[in-house]
Design a protein with these regions (language model features):
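Buried hydrophobic positions in well-ordered alpha/beta secondary-structure cores of metabolic enzymes
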Residues: 32-33, 63, 96, 133
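Pyridoxal 5′-phosphate
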Residues: 45-49, 63-64, 81, 91-95, ...
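PLP-dependent aspartate aminotransferase-fold enzymes
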Residues: 1-59
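Active-site C-terminal subdomain of aminotransferase-like
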Residues: 124-168
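Short acidic loop-to-helix transition motifs that present clustered carboxylates
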Residues: 25-26, 46-53, 70-71, 97-101, ...
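Conserved active-site segment immediately N-terminal to the catalytic lysine
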Residues: 107-123
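Active-site core of PLP-dependent enzymes with the aminotransferase class I/II
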Residues: 68-87, 98-105
Length: 168
């Protein structure tokens, strides 16, 4: 969903490809490739750890990074994020919530979208799912998010009430 959100929101990039860091989990790469094939857009896997970010030449609509990476490394992604932004690309970071208690969050590094799984916070295993996850966006991308946003309000008697704040 984050890749599709970047493609919807980054109208300036047109039909440019999405670049995936080679240090993403293999299952994440497989899911994104499957969606890309079904929807007809190009995906490229590249090592994005180089000094210039390792971004391939040509037009890019967005990049996807992971923190920590598949190999367990914790990398400062601010350089590749800045390089991607300079080229008009949006950035998604797949981030482990527990790791974010110790490292710089994706939003503070300039990422547009952060996603991840929350199963490690005590949701019991349930034969592969379902379990909770999160999708967070920078300000201004809320209307590009899929689904519905629920807001907290007060009813006529002053009690807490939940309402649909946004539906896409």
């Amino acid at each position: 969903e984050a890749v599709l959100l970047m493609r919807r929101a980054n109208k300036a990039a047109g039909d440019a490809r999405t670049v995936l860091d080679a240090n993403l989990f293999p299952q994440t790469i497989a899911v994104i490739r499957g969606r890309a094939e079904a929807l007809g857009f190009e995906v490229e896997v590249a090592d994005l750890t180089g000094p210039d970010g390792g971004l391939p030449e040509g037009a890019i609509s967005g990049i996807v990074l992971q923190q920590p990476g598949d190999d367990g490394s914790v990398v400062d992604h601010s350089g590749v994020i800045a390089a991607a932004k300079d080229r008009g690309a949006m950035v998604t970071v797949v981030a482990d919530l527990l790791a974010l208690t110790l490292i710089v969050p994706p939003g503070e590094q300039g990422a547009d979208v952060a996603v991840g799984n929350t199963q490690r916070f005590g949701v019991p295993l349930f034969f592969g799912g379902p379990h909770a996850a999160y999708l967070a966006v920078r300000e201004g991308l809320e209307r590009s998010m899929p689904g519905r946003l629920v807001g907290v309000s007060k009813d006529q008697q002053g009690r807490t009430a939940y309402r649909l704040a946004l539906q896409t």
